[in-house]
């Protein structure tokens, strides 16, 4: 009898995963397990990156096994910064391979773009829950791509901000964002205008040089730094990085992959999972940065939810 893995397209993943909020409990558990070392049962090497210099791209390979969920996955991600404006292919493309951990059989090949967008935003929401100032009224989003939309969705569900601002290098994309999402969003003409007085800042840009400067940031603000995922790319300047309390998803990955951390020489205070576990404090009263690089265990948690939902509905 022939057998082949289930192929789940982006619309399938969207249907079976639903709101990013459904991921929150499982992701908090996964973050805590990851930061528990061998006791947490997460086996996850740092992402392997294969440069494709000829075409200004790279292939990232992200395998993981999580004993708690009994989930075995590998995510493949490609990123091409030199994409032609006429190209119909997105700059980021991801695929998740979901295996049966008991025998190694490939159970499913999933579109990973929805998974990546939703799990990344959900982890930012977890960081914000722990680290944002007690009275947070103004949310600022820098960038207007896929991650901006996924972050806005879950942040509107989980928090009550009185004002939301957005900036994007191409202003028409910020205007499109404001017209598309539910709720009032103020489009700003500069980063400084957008971040001045903001309590929570989300950076989801394609920047390779700092765009956010410490002199503009309100003391005590919380920043979710999501872009700049290569060791020579940055979104935040030295003033922010050296004077903040710095949290990361993975110390090992941040010291290998994050230009914001490596080039500034900033000291990492804690992994987010350590805060979730309660072994490291959340310094709400200080300016905090959560540097998010994304982890394979986050993809595994989301992929398992998708697969279990799909298989139960067959």
From Swiss-Prot:
UniProt subcellular location: Cytoplasm
Keywords: Cytoplasm, Eye lens protein, NAD, NADP, Oxidoreductase
Gene Ontology cellular-component terms listed: cytoplasm
Protein EC: 1.5.1.25, 1.5.1.1
Gene Ontology BP terms: thyroid hormone metabolic process
Broad EC category: oxidoreductase
Reactions accelerated catalytically: L-pipecolate + NADP(+) = Delta(1)-piperideine-2-carboxylate + NADPH + H(+); L-pipecolate + NAD(+) = Delta(1)-piperideine-2-carboxylate + NADH + H(+); L-proline + NADP(+) = 1-pyrroline-2-carboxylate + NADPH + H(+); L-proline + NAD(+) = 1-pyrroline-2-carboxylate + NADH + H(+)
SUPFAM superfamilies: NAD(P)-binding Rossmann-fold domains
InterPro entries linked: NAD(P)-bd_dom_sf, ODC_Mu_crystall, ODC_N
Chief localization: cytoplasm
Annotated positions binding NADPH: 91-92, 119, 144, 146-147, 168-170, 173, 205-206, 226, 292
Binding site for 3,3',5-triiodo-L-thyronine: 47, 257
Superkingdom, taxonomy of origin: Eukaryota
Distribution of this protein across tissues and organs: Expressed at high abundance in lens, but outside the lens it is preferentially expressed in neural tissues, retina and brain.
Claim: Transmembrane is one of the keywords in the record: no
GO molecular function: structural constituent of eye lens; thiomorpholine-carboxylate dehydrogenase activity; thyroid hormone binding
Protein family per UniProt: Belongs to the ornithine cyclodeaminase/mu-crystallin family.
Record note on quaternary structure: Homodimer. Binds the thyroid hormone triiodothyronine (T3); T3 binding inhibits enzymatic activity.
General function of this protein: Catalyzes the NAD(P)H-dependent reduction of imine double bonds of a number of cyclic ketimine substrates, including sulfur-containing cyclic ketimines. Under physiological conditions, it efficiently catalyzes delta(1)-piperideine-2-carboxylate (P2C) and delta(1)-pyrroline-2-carboxylate (Pyr2C) reduction, suggesting a central role in lysine and glutamate metabolism. Additional substrates are delta(2)-thiazoline-2-carboxylate (T2C), 3,4-dehydrothiomorpholine-3-carboxylate (AECK), and (R)-lanthionine ketimine (LK) that is reduced at very low rate compared to other substrates.
Protein name according to UniProt: Ketimine reductase mu-crystallin
Gene name tied to this protein: CRYM
